[in-house]
């Protein structure tokens, strides 16, 4: 690994507190996040890459607590994982057998956050990339792809009333310190 490489990443699965409160609270949240963990396993490429997964109920939703006159907790799941991707090593032009040059020599697993979360080209109805005026493909942000994958997994797991986060949102991720300052 390069000295400045990212060795691990974190996914935070967060759902509106009202969703859990309307479905029974803590027990429902536990089952939901057990299923969300299965989605995380699929998203990161396997359970062997997950270092930690913890459901938190350590925050009170103040607005709902005041409105309902009882404590309503905010549940979320933190998943810490190693961002591993498959990388193909090709035979170089120094190979003695010229027929092998450019073909796959071996496939290795590589730690790479940038390759794990690369943006993907948007496709039209025919499956072809949508192009910008300069001829380059329009890219769908990797976090949008992640949200789509999570949403689709949870719908397939039976959570048919769940709603996907706002598409095209320009909201930025905040560190814990930035969030607390706000």
Map each language-model feature to its residues.
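Accessible peptide chain termini
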Residues: 1-2, 150
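Structured, beta-strand-rich domain cores
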Residues: 2-75, 81
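Single-stranded nucleic-acid nicking/binding segments centered on His-rich, glycine/basic loops
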Residues: 62-63, 85-182
């Amino acid at each position: 690994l390069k000295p400045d490489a990212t060795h691990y990443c974190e996914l935070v699965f967060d759902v509106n507190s009202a969703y859990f409160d309307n479905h029974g609270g803590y027990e429902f949240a536990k089952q939901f996040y057990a299923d969300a963990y299965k989605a995380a396993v699929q998203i990161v490429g396997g359970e062997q890459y997950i270092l930690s997964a913890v459901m938190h109920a350590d925050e009170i939703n103040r607005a709902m607590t005041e409105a309902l006159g009882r404590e309503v907790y905010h549940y979320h799941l933190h998943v810490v994982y190693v961002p591993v991707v498959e990388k193909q090593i090709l035979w170089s032009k120094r190979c003695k057998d010229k027929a092998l040059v450019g073909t796959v020599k071996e496939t290795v697993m590589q730690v790479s956050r940038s390759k794990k979360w690369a943006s993907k080209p948007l496709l039209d109805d025919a499956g072809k990339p949508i192009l910008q005026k300069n001829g380059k493909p329009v890219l769908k942000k990797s976090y949008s792809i992640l949200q789509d994958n999570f949403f689709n997994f949870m719908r397939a797991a039976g959570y048919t009333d769940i709603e996907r986060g706002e598409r095209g949102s320009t909201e930025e991720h905040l560190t814990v310190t930035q969030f607390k300052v706000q």
